[in-house]
A protein has these predicted regions:
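C-terminal beta-strand-rich structural cap/linker in extracellular carbohydrate-active enzymes
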Residues: 569-590
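Hydrophobic faces of well-ordered beta-strands that scaffold small-molecule active sites
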Residues: 141-143, 199-201, 245-247, 335, ...
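Aromatic-rich carbohydrate-binding modules that target alpha-glucans
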Residues: 31-82, 91-107
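Aromatic/acidic polysaccharide-binding cleft in carbohydrate-active enzymes
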Residues: 148, 160, 377-383, 423-445, ...
Length: 590
């Protein structure tokens, strides 16, 4: 038995409350393990002083998730008295061991007279400790908008655009196109018809850049984009169309015209805002565009984005007031936290607590590009941007992987966090910080295969503006081209728009596409032919997904309703094709 591959801690993803009645227990093993049971019961089922031996009830665990080198076994328990005490029985071939908190024992060793067994414990299922992200997020299909690049209002004044809207080539970092809040408002019906139920706007507050990530004021809408009244009108209309609104919050750093920063730079240690920042040299050097000399801490060593001290109670209180107003007065439904892994945990806990008092259903999303377990304990972010999903999906095509490797990658993403968080992870194919999906994919066919996976995986799916029409673009700033409304009006994007709409409608109509179990099927002789199904336990249907990443066509045994397809000719799936089919569970289960 490969003991080095076996692990369990009675915390977070290994042992956690799924809801107020159920507890999930997971055990990691190597692939040599053939059976696992959990022996569990209330720790006080046989008294509390040790006069009588404790013994539990064995329950078989299921091999739930297969990774490249490991298996994760899982069981759902329903503790009658909210507590659990447990250990494991693990079998590999003819060898069986018992696993306690302090290690492994043979059955004989475990029962040795005088043995003080160190059981695993789930002490108490407190309702306040259950991770409960907002229910509405799983059902939401998001649309990310960069206001300067999405749409210019029909009667909006031409403030300071430097480029013609029709010119989307050779974009420079400081170019502006003049998009604004009125333009977004005018296109809300377009988004509703696309199937969008949530919009996420990159920053809209006062700044001298087109992206507004160097904020000068957190209370003033940038006049390039409009007014507070226009924002309220946008939110009101969006809500009337069934669309929620999320703002982008830049609290890791600010812009150099932010009044507290200006005061600190001017007055040094005498400034009441000195401790709002991390200034290491004063007066500040006047030369240089980078802070690598340590003059002060900033985002990515850029002088235009000094880092805020989110450990400071005054900074925390300031942003508590700011965000509470956004939610209370503007009826904002969600807040996305830029550079969400660099602000302090204290800041997030206190800010989250105050915002949930204003609106318990407000959605708090962190921008984190890596394993985010530390921020998803239930008292900080509700979710994070799922960059591991985007990267893992892309690697299947980049590295010419097999369907097994795609499964391993998807399973890794789905085992980073508790199950209820998987249903609200913010999934996407591209953002304003990445190469455009269709450009990265190299073909429209591959792009729609990836979009089909996005729309059939657990989480909350997001479309970056223009992704619905397969808008191309390289790395930043080329990924921020203006939305080509003229081409859309001329019908040049009809095929892509139609296919995207079908996928979104399918996701909304069939809940199993965004929650429930994933069943994989593999054929080692056809490693690039991908098959998986989405299934909710007890249902009389599954949603089967077929991707042909081979160089040859594949005959499908289709027996149900085709919900979506590209490059499907009769029952033959051509190379680069995808088919999503409503089928009977018997085809996939058993």
């Amino acid at each position: 038995m490969n003991f080095a591959a076996i692990s369990h801690k009675s915390t977070f993803t290994d042992c956690y409350a799924l809801n107020t009645d159920e507890v999930i227990v997971n055990l990691h093993t190597g692939k040599d393990v053939t059976a696992v049971s959990i022996i569990h019961d209330d720790p006080f089922a046989h008294g509390c002083m040790g006069h009588r031996p404790w013994y539990g009830t064995p329950v078989a665990m299921k091999p739930e998730w297969e990774l490249k080198h490991n298996m994760i076994w899982s069981v759902k328990l329903r503790p009658e008295f909210k507590r659990e005490q447990y250990y494991f029985s693990i079998t590999a071939g003819n060898e069986t061991v018992l696993m306690f908190e302090d290690g492994f024992y043979t059955p004989g060793e475990a029962e040795k007279k005088g043995r003080m067994k160190q059981y695993f414990k789930f002490p108490w299922l407190n309702s306040a400790d259950v991770i409960t992200p907002p229910d509405w997020v799983n059902e939401t299909v998001w649309y990310q908008i960069m206001p300067d690049r999405f749409c210019r209002g029909s009667d909006a004044p031409k403030r300071f655009p430097t480029r013609k809207w029709s010119d989307g080539k050779n974009i420079h970092f400081w170019d502006t196109y003049g998009g604004d809040l009125k333009g977004i408002t005018e296109k809300l019906e377009y988004l509703r018809d696309l199937g969008i139920t949530g919009i996420y706007m990159t920053p809209i507050f006062l700044s001298n850049s087109n992206h507004k990530y160097n904020t000068f004021s957190y209370e003033t809408i940038d006049p390039d984009f409009g007014t507070e009244e226009e924002l309220v009108a946008l939110v009101d209309k969006a809500h009337s169309l069934g669309i929620r609104v999320m703002l982008d919050a830049v609290f890791n750093h600010c812009g150099t015209e932010f009044a507290p920063w200006q005061d600190a730079v001017k007055n040094g240690l005498e400034s009441p805002y000195w401790d709002w920042f991390f200034i290491n040299q004063w007066p500040l050097p006047k030369l240089g565009m980078k802070t690598e000399d340590g003059r002060y801490y900033s985002f990515a060593f850029g002088t235009m984005m000094p880092k805020l001290n989110t450990n400071n109670p005054e900074v925390i209180a300031y942003f508590q007031r700011i965000c509470s107003r956004w939610v209370r007065d503007w009826h904002i439904d969600g807040i996305r936290f830029d550079v969400g892994n660099e602000v302090s945990h204290k800041f997030l806990k206190e800010l989250g607590r105050s915002l949930k008092q204003v609106d318990p259903d407000v959605f708090l999303l962190g921008e984190i590009w890596h394993d985010s377990s530390s921020w998803l304990q239930g008292d900080e972010y509700d979710s994070v941007m799922n960059y591991p999903f985007m990267e893992s999906l892309h690697n299947f095509w980049l590295d010419h992987q097999s369907s097994w490797e795609l499964m391993y990658s998807m399973n890794r993403c789905l085992t980073l966090y508790p199950r209820q968080l998987n249903n609200v992870l913010f999934n996407f194919l591209d953002t304003h910080d990445t190469m455009r999906a269709v450009t990265r994919c190299g073909s429209v066919n591959t792009f729609f295969q990836q979009l089909a996976v996005l729309m059939t995986m657990p989480g909350s799916a997001c479309i970056y503006y223009g992704t619905e029409i397969a808008l191309p673009g390289g790395d930043d700033p080329d990924c921020r081209r203006p939305m080509p409304w003229d081409k859309i009006a001329e019908g040049k994007c009809d095929r892509a728009l139609r296919d995207t709409k079908v996928l979104i409608e399918m996701r909304k109509a069939y809940p199993e596409t965004r929650m429930g179990e994933i069943i994989w099927k593999h054929d080692d002789e056809k490693p690039r032919f991908v098959r998986y199904a989405r299934y909710v336990e007890g249902s009389d249907r599954v949603v089967g997904v077929y991707l042909n990443a081979q160089e040859t066509s594949e005959k499908l045994n289709l027996t149900g309703k085709v919900l979506f397809s590209r490059n499907l000719r009769g029952k033959t799936l051509m190379p680069g094709g995808v088919a999503i089919v409503l089928e009977e569970p018997e085809k996939w289960i058993g």
